[in-house]
């Protein structure tokens, strides 16, 4: 379904998963913050820890398991909610600010979108097909303005969804101020 985008608000999303393949891996954590066109958060957002299947947890490779152990996420999974409940919470949060057509935003957002599409189809249905991927802007800065790229904020989120969302917003704000400043 193609819905018209909401012109000013951006729906920032980050997911933590058991791996990168939505056909076999599952969601562990989802964070969403809605901002206005000036990248100012409308509120604190929503962060949900999801309870994955024991099969998905057991299939995590060592690198991913270590990453989620160090971040503390694995310790929180016992208090996670079913993905259906997480979907309802995320949808309720988004529709508080954007009825339909929210532009999904974040870093390397295509992977997050695949997981949202598979595990949260009701959320996917209210998002526009367009996306703002900060990592694409970063790649342009690397090639066209390395001096600007070198001044970009360092990421410290430690693979936790809300920290990653907030860092992505800050990173786009940096590129907006320093890189996307031309006039026509």
Curated annotation (Swiss-Prot):
Q: Which UniProt keywords apply?
A: Cytoplasm, Exonuclease, Hydrolase, Nuclease
A molecular function GO annotation: nucleic acid binding
User: What residue stretches are annotated with the Exonuclease domain?
Assistant: 10-172
Q: What are the subcellular locations of this protein?
A: Cytoplasm
- Record has Repeat as a keyword: no
Q: Name one GO cellular component term.
A: cytoplasm
Pfam families of this UniProt entry? RNase_T
* Major enzyme class: hydrolase
Primary place of residence? Answer: cytoplasm
Q: Which domain of life is it from?
A: Bacteria
- Annotated InterPro entries: Exonuclease_RNaseT/DNA_pol3 (IPR013520), Oligoribonuclease (IPR022894), RNaseH-like_sf (IPR012337), RNaseH_sf (IPR036397)
Q: What is its EC number?
A: 3.1.15.-
Query: Has UniProt tagged this entry with the keyword Cytoplasm?
Result: yes
Question: What is known about what this protein does?
Answer: 3'-to-5' exoribonuclease specific for small oligoribonucleotides.
Protein name per its UniProtKB record: Oligoribonuclease
């Amino acid at each position: 379904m193609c819905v018209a985008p909401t012109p000013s608000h951006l729906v920032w999303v980050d997911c933590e998963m058991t791996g990168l393949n939505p056909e076999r891996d599952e969601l562990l954590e989802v964070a969403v913050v809605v901002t206005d066109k000036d990248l100012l958060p409308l509120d604190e957002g929503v962060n949900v820890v999801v309870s994955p299947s024991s099969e998905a947890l057991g299939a995590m490779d060592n690198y991913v398991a270590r990453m989620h152990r160090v971040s503390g996420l694995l310790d929180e999974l016992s208090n996670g909610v079913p993905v259906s409940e997480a979907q309802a919470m995320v949808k309720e949060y988004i529709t508080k600010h954007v009825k339909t057509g929210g532009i999904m935003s974040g870093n390397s957002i295509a992977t997050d979108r695949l997981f949202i599409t598979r595990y949260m189809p009701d959320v996917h249905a209210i998002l526009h097909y367009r996306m703002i991927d900060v990592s694409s802007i970063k790649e342009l800065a690397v090639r066209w303005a390395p001096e600007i790229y070198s001044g970009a904020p360092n990421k410290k989120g430690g693979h936790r969804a809300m920290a990653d969302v907030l860092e992505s917003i800050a990173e786009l704000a940096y590129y907006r101020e320093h890189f996307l400043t031309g006039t026509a």
